[in-house]
């Protein structure tokens, strides 16, 4: 097939990006994310992103934050996209140039985010293992956040730090 015709998502692509950021920034992606992004929107003050045995951030999954911080992350991303900052321009370009995945749901993929048509307009969607979704609907200026868990999901102990998140419920 011709380059750019169809996207074949693979987690190793995201992992390669994590290794690249680690090399350029001189720190794990999780630390870079915390210092450069999370510190700007994180209100609860706790996030965790799993690393492999070599210390490389597992960039394709297991970024854990409170629901409030996930919503704040969505708001932050929408503000960045509107302001056309470097980060916002990156995601805008990804949405505008997203490549068809061939999935029956009509999804596309662009620059580390999924793109779905919502009411006829392409919108950025973050999707996680086990049933997490965040839809950034810029047309209505709303964020749809769904945090769920499939009982059949067997990708390690996602709840090893649940106590740190539960502390934020008071």
Task: Identify the residue ranges that each predicted region occupies.
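Active-site Gly/Thr loop motif
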Residues: 44-47, 91-148, 152-153
């Amino acid at each position: 097939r011709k380059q750019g015709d169809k996207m074949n998502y693979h987690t190793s692509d995201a992992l390669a990006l994590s290794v690249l950021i680690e090399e350029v920034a001189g720190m794990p992606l999780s630390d870079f994310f915390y210092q450069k992004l999370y510190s700007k929107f994180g209100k609860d003050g706790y996030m965790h992103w799993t690393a492999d045995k070599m210390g490389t951030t597992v960039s394709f999954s297991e970024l854990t934050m409170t629901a409030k911080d996930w919503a704040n992350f969505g708001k932050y991303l929408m503000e960045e996209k509107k302001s056309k900052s470097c980060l916002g321009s990156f995601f805008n370009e990804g949405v505008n140039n997203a490549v068809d995945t061939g999935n029956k749901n009509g999804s596309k993929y662009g620059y580390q985010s999924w793109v779905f048509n919502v009411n006829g307009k392409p919108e950025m969607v973050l999707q996680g293992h086990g049933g997490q979704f965040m839809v950034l609907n810029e047309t209505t200026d709303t964020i749809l956040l769904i945090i769920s868990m499939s009982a059949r999901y067997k990708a390690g102990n996602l709840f090893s730090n649940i106590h740190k998140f539960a502390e934020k419920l008071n």
